[in-house]
């Protein structure tokens, strides 16, 4: 496997060839997932689906980005993320987990448009360092170095908390989330698409690996954090005037929902959580892409100015409507199916969650419909050409593709 990947470096400076090579690599992974190497192996279909999603996002980035250096950084990030999904031991997983921060950091510092990008980079580094070093401490104090990447040791509650902390920063859960809106607002559109679509999935994928530890301890603290994150972040969405910040807080609500699905340690919750991760990856990538396109054409990200899409470009308007309807979880989108599974499993485990979910969906519908109506009605500020978004249509099909369900059931 390693020699194949070294061969891929030959294509590295030709982004389109590299994309096709990675697609072929993905097909090999799908057909050969029992293929054990020394350091990497494909252990689960959910991780293969995440690899497919990362390649899909790379394809959209290739089509939408013209800056060669940003394309190279995107390729580096996708390779690191693919390696993160298939390691055989914990230290490799940790290494790629931390390595994934650097391409995003270079994108923000090198290609962000405002001076606040320095502040947001400080936030990113500080949160990453503070939450990740405890993971190394637990790693050296326990027997992880002789274990495979799935581990279910009987650890104390404090150790499990410290272990989860680094993944919680990448979810991100509410209270560890401050770096995300700042990074999104300062990052170029490509970095935002990769950050929302790929980087947040590393936290959930890592947390999936350590779910075995949680079966020995009380995980009430994560349930409370997930409930708080769902409600507080969706309230934050209501008060945002910047469309990119709104999309960032919307990511936090969805990832809190995924956390709630995973910490009720039951199979249906885990399945719903993984499908929700995939749905969120496709939806949020497109959300940031559309907001970025609007910003490039109009020079503003204000929700107030995002009016009259339907008057200026019909395809743009329809795509915008489909993406935000999918973000709300309307059927037959992948979001709706996964949310339905998660709701049914969480109500089985905890009856109280009905009230939290009620408030969450009420507020989530509100901010999505508010953005949708404010963009549909009103006086037109911007004229969109029809070609700006022609290549995003496949992503919408992927988002609404119920076929993914057959992999799980």
Curated annotation (Swiss-Prot):
The keyword Cell membrane does not apply. It catalyses: a ubiquinone + NADH + 5 H(+)(in) = a ubiquinol + NAD(+) + 4 H(+)(out). Pfam families: Proton_antipo_M (PF00361). Its main location: mitochondrion. One of its GO terms (cellular component) is mitochondrial membrane. The chain crosses the membrane at residues 9-29, 44-64, 68-88, 90-110, 125-145, 160-180, 194-214, 221-241, 246-268, 273-295, 305-325, 352-372, 389-409. It comes from the Eukaryota. It is found in: Mitochondrion membrane. Keywords: Electron transport, Membrane, Mitochondrion, NAD, Respiratory chain, Translocase, Transmembrane, Transmembrane helix, Transport, Ubiquinone. Belongs to the complex I subunit 4 family. This is NADH-ubiquinone oxidoreductase chain 4. The gene is ND4.
